[in-house]
Amino acid sequence: DIEYYAYIINQAILNGCNFSELEEASFWAVVEQKYMLLQEKVSTALFAEKTFFVDNIDYKLYQTFCEKTPSVFEPHSDDPRMKELTELVSHVIPGNEPALDFPCLFLTYFANAYFGIAQCCQIDALRSAIEQVMDEHTKNVLLTVLMSVMSAAASTTTHFAQFLKVKSKSTCNNLLTKRKINIIEECKELMKEYRKSGLCSKKEYTTFDCYNLDFSE
């Protein structure tokens, strides 16, 4: 588990957590609250994105929409639908503390790259809510849920190399299929599976050690 994400996943699988259904319901309420806030911040871009979630769209229109999406890497856009997102991006400087009082890392870094715009809002809401969880075991399980769903929904190959771009009708359809996935709802479904397996009801931790080290160390 030399990679930190692998360390988190190993911790979650081996040690589980004690996360009651009531605690989980409160967690999802926090997630929804954060998601609603983020939706308000980029409502125009989200409305525009949703118009592409239908059958038989002109792939060139979606290609242009994606290419004109601003990020910290390409902060300028002349698309009026991106005005709100461009404003957010202007407040984020890589390597510096965020100047905004709400979570928007994925929204300002990876919108219409590795994930759709709505998906980035969902991921930021989830990650921010997870960070507020005090118990480390529970946090590890929730992070594992999020990473699992992100891996399935990402607009990329399975090893998260370069993100996929709209180049044809087929690549457009492939991307839109992935970007229609609601990350929050998929996380809820996966949590149900984890709970069924007993991963969320370990009242006494067996505590297997994970070291975040290379095997040679």
Where are these regions (language model features)?
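Class I S-adenosyl-L-methionine-dependent methyltransferase module
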Residues: 5-196
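Adenosine-cofactor binding site in Rossmann-like domains, unifying the SAM/SAH pocket
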Residues: 199-217
